Amino acid sequence: MPYDSVYSEKRPPGTLRTAWRKFYSDASAMVGLYGCAGLAVLCIFGGWFAPYGIDQQFLGYQLLPPSWSRYGEVSFFLGTDDLGRDVLSRLLSGAAPTVGGAFVVTLAATICGLVLGTFAGATHGLRSAVLNHILDTLLAIPSLLLAIIVVAFAGPSLSHAMFAVWLALLPRMVRSIYSMVHDELEKEYVIAARLDGASTLNILWFAVMPNITAGLVTEITRALSMAILDIAALGFLDLGAQLPSPEWGAMLGDALELIYVAPWTVMLPGAAIMISVLLVNLLGDGVRRAIIAGVE
């Protein structure tokens, strides 16, 4: 009796599976993923992990070096500052105002930028031209300078600094999304979809948005890195979070005069800012490469 040999058809992996395989095989992307996950945990639970209070002072233990130093104490792993406060506790608690604040600012700028940029990219004529010239004018001003101007009028505080950074990031985000949407709408597949009777909303949601995801991830990564640096810079200039806040930029500015006496009080907050920006960029680049591989 003859037997029919039936072979199951091998299905190619889907877009998400292909993107995840590409992301998982990228070592730098996984480092960024785990690092950003650690930053998220610190933003939420950093105050609970801190062994001491952020304002708790220990008399007689001022300017102790880190514990691995010859004159360090095990009780103060990263040493103390000029007021006898534990540096590790302040760094752990400072992740929320620096990285957490930057994440909130970036999320708000992304949402507003998506709405305004998509609307601007889908329109033509006078409205698009006016918005384009306004964005070009705002982009001519550096983001940090614009944030300093806003804080100078509003007053120094963390909330005002976050608003100023959001206001500085918004034109760049709107301009980038506007350019991506405008370029996609000029392509042939969009024209074909319009000829088939697809509405503008369907074209934007089902055709344009999936094709600008990689560029959008790049812009979000850049915006988050800029937000971390700008919030820290405003704190360093005493225009953002005010002491005794453990915000990393404020810690860096407060300890600047101790750089020759106690260099760890300057190097540790600066290293925290640098590592945070590096991890965000590693994650963003990995996600962008994975999305491109999945789409292709």
Swiss-Prot record:
Signal peptide: none annotated. It comes from the Bacteria. PROSITE patterns: ABC_TM1. It is found in: Cell inner membrane. GO terms for cellular component: ATP-binding cassette (ABC) transporter complex, substrate-binding subunit-containing; membrane; plasma membrane. GO terms for biological process: peptide transport; putrescine transport. Coiled coil: none annotated. Residues 50-98, 155-196, 244-257 are periplasmic. InterPro entries: BP-dependent_transpt_permease (IPR050366), MetI-like (IPR000515), MetI-like_sf (IPR035906), OppC_N (IPR025966). Gene3D superfamilies: MetI-like (1.10.3720.10). The keyword Cell inner membrane applies. Part of a putrescine export transport system, does not play a role in resistance to antimicrobial peptides. Belongs to the binding-protein-dependent transport system permease family. OppBC subfamily. This is Putrescine export system permease protein SapC. The gene is sapC.
